[in-house]
Amino acid sequence: MQNRNTFSWIKEQMTRSISVSIMIYVITRTAISNAYPIFAQQGYENPREATGRIVCANCHLANKPVDIEVPQAVLPDTVFEAVVRIPYDMQVKQVLANGKKGALNVGAVLILPEGFELAPPDRISPEMKEKIGKLSFQSYRPTKKNILVIGPVPGQKYSEITFPILSPDPATKKDVHFLKYPIYVGGNRGRGQIYPDGSKSNNTVYNATAAGIISKIVRKEKGGYEISIADASDGHQVVDIIPPGPELLVSEGESIKLDQPLTSNPNVGGFGQGDAEIVLQDPLRVQGLLFFLASVILAQIFLVLKKKQFEKVQLSEMNF
């Protein structure tokens, strides 16, 4: 009877431990999968360095294009679209964290001038909401409302991202002026090659950490490899760990050099950055321009009428 109770207690504890482990795994995986923009937010006070380089390039090493489209000029307290395009071949698949192949995700950071910010929902038109879809934007910092981040989101659906932006009003914000301002954007497609702590992801090439002869290659049960290298200098064994994902390029007995690629480079994505300019236009200046154009048109009309009147007078004098 005592043995049966002991067995039941052990079984209950094992079931509870397994349940807790599963919950921790699910929570961790969810946090990691949704934390890519957070990497930059946690590590850098400002996503744009003094050199002009956007910090996302520290983890996404391949250079790819990105495009931004904004109006040439906007009026104060006006909602407008900033459209970011992140082009890539929709047919390609990327290496996922588990080593399997999957669709690419995309993300973007939009650095607006001081005073510009994400438009509130009640100011966004139905047409613009339809373009935005189910995207959820967030500020880079609570104190930096002019810097917006988005992602990772499915690339096949959101390779073109529409940001709803509200322009500032210098009448209420004294530090904002009617000027031409720069806008900076960074956009990535696919996973990065380096994590913020400096470690490699499985979405990059792995190189030999020693020169010598490959003495043994062990294929791990969950994917990846352990490559044993007999060091050329003293013969001691150096083991390089290859995670699931990259394809192996070497074989046992092969002589290799230091930093020689052991795997292919599975990365199909990359990061790009661009910029644009926008003018915060003074309404009074626009009104003055319209008044000037109207006066020029009226002057032209009066000139034509005066010319016709003069021609009539000349014609009548000739007939007389």
Curated annotation (Swiss-Prot):
Entry GO terms, CC: chloroplast thylakoid membrane
Secretion signal span: 1-35
Any matching Pfam family: Apocytochr_F_C
Compartment(s) where it occurs, according to its Swiss-Prot or TrEMBL record: Plastid, Chloroplast thylakoid membrane
Positions that bind heme: Y36, C56, C59, H60
Cofactors (names): heme
Membrane topology, record value: Single-pass membrane protein
Keywords, in A-Z order: Chloroplast, Electron transport, Heme, Iron, Membrane, Metal-binding, Photosynthesis, Plastid, Signal, Thylakoid, Transmembrane, Transmembrane helix, Transport
Keyword Transport: yes
Superkingdom: Eukaryota
Cofactor note: Binds 1 heme group covalently.
Annotated TM spans: 286-306
Family the UniProt entry places it in: Belongs to the cytochrome f family.
Physiological role: Component of the cytochrome b6-f complex, which mediates electron transfer between photosystem II (PSII) and photosystem I (PSI), cyclic electron flow around PSI, and state transitions.
Protein name, per record: Cytochrome f
Originating organism: Platanus occidentalis (Sycamore)
Gene: petA
